[in-house]
């Protein structure tokens, strides 16, 4: 389970980072931004369904420190 959770967290963070990158580049189309936002929301939705929001936020804080 730990490996699956790690994969989910890393995937979600990657999708989030990509969303931020796309949003910071004005040449990207609104459609591309929305498509990336949907990918992030899908990944984060799995975290929500598994009631892992607290664990994910702690993991993000640890990665950022």
Q: What are these model-derived regions, one by one?
A:
Residues 1-34:
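N-terminal acidic leader/helix
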């Amino acid at each position: 389970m730990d490996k699956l959770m790690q994969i989910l967290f890393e995937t979600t963070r990657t999708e989030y980072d990509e969303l931020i990158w796309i949003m910071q580049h004005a040449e990207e189309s609104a459609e591309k931004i929305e498509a990336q936002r949907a990918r992030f929301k899908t990944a984060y939705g799995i975290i929500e369904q598994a009631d892992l929001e607290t664990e994910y936020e702690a993991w993000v804080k640890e990665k950022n420190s």
